[in-house]
Amino acid sequence: MFRAETFEADATGHLPDQKVLAAKITEMGKSLEALRVAPITDPYNGPAILSGRAAAGFFHEVLGHRLEGQRQRGDDEGQTFTKLLGKQILPSFMSVSDDPTLKKFDGTWLSGHYYYDDEGQQARRVDLIKNGVLDTFLMSRLPIAGFAHSNGHGRAEVGHMPTGRQGNLIVTSSKTV
């Protein structure tokens, strides 16, 4: 079993104090104990409601990576959305953008913030899906068919070439529950 808590800040002075950290440790301990004694359930396949970090992780992994430009390039990348440009891929009440210019959102520091990408291009908001319709991809300077220019999302891991990557993926909905 594993439990972790992460804190995002632009400087150490913005991290939680010892009292908050101690409370989180106690909370994680209680959560682990509850998991340890919880009954094992059968796998579930059906609708789910996600919130908070679970929703963020889901959209980052399942949708965000598929919208990175290099994922449209080769067969080995899946090309999930390559032929769906201009088509409905989400409900019309949902839109998705990526905005590395945001430092904070609702009081939370965002780790995807940057001023310039790893190719020297100025960071900027990109509206990827508008009202459910796929509009564009996250691009570096390495072109793909139909996209000759960077949109400020060229990011690289140490020792690797920059590719179109997520900064701060923002999912919005005009319908809420």
Question: Model features per residue range: what roles?
Answer:
Residues 58-76, 156-162, 170-171:
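Short N-terminal helix-initiation segments at or just after the protein's N-terminus
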Residues 68-93:
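Amphipathic alpha-helical
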Residues 84-177:
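Dual-mode signal for accessory low-complexity, basic/Gly-rich regions
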